[in-house]
Amino acid sequence: MHFTVEAQKIVADHLLPGNIAIDATAGNGHDTVFLANTVGPHGKVHAIDIQGQAIERLQQTLSQLDLLERVEVYAADHALIEQVVAPKLSSFVDCAMFNLGYLPHSDKSITTHRASTLRAVEGAYRLLKPGGMMTVLAYVGHPGGRDEAEGVSAWLESHADDLRVDRIQDESNPQSPILWVINKNP
């Protein structure tokens, strides 16, 4: 199973043209482009990444695909999601996507971490409208990845009364990524 594709399929069933979405870990921009195409010309995507290299690639890709007008790009730590994105919002967010870990084909020592990810997930949750969806894809096979995933799992458990959570993982593979599909109660 390709977990990124699975996350996008699930989000595609929820997100509508004209909606507002967040790509909290923009990276190479695959989720950002998917979200921008899904929300259409009347929607908006807010894409965040801490790495300048990722931001440059993302802006080039968005320009080539004529999607720049649909996307606000922020060079910032995803832990600051609420402070960075909230001032630009006219309403709550319909969907947020997280693809944790490191930027493919780059410095693998630069990764998301438990503390910043938990701040980011909490911030995105507060920006999410009732009935909104969030996906979090965690990779446990890199240093710090399992700790980060355990932190996300604990955060979800602590908010169990406010959320409906589906967990997707290849249980036969202990190194399998974990995809959480989170729906905020209406």
Regions found by a protein language model. Give the residues of each.
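S-adenosyl-L-methionine
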Residues: 1-24, 30-33, 37-38, 55-91
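Short glycine-dipeptide loop
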Residues: 17-18, 40-43, 128-134
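Conserved beta-strand signature within the Rossmann-like core of class I S-adenosyl-L-methionine
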Residues: 25, 120, 127-138
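Short "lid" loop at the C-terminus of a central beta-strand within the Rossmann-like core
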Residues: 27, 102-103, 139-143
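Conserved SAM-binding motif I beta-strand of class I
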Residues: 44-49
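Mobile active-site "lid"/loop adjacent to the S-adenosyl-L-methionine
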Residues: 98-120
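Class I S-adenosyl-L-methionine
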Residues: 142-186
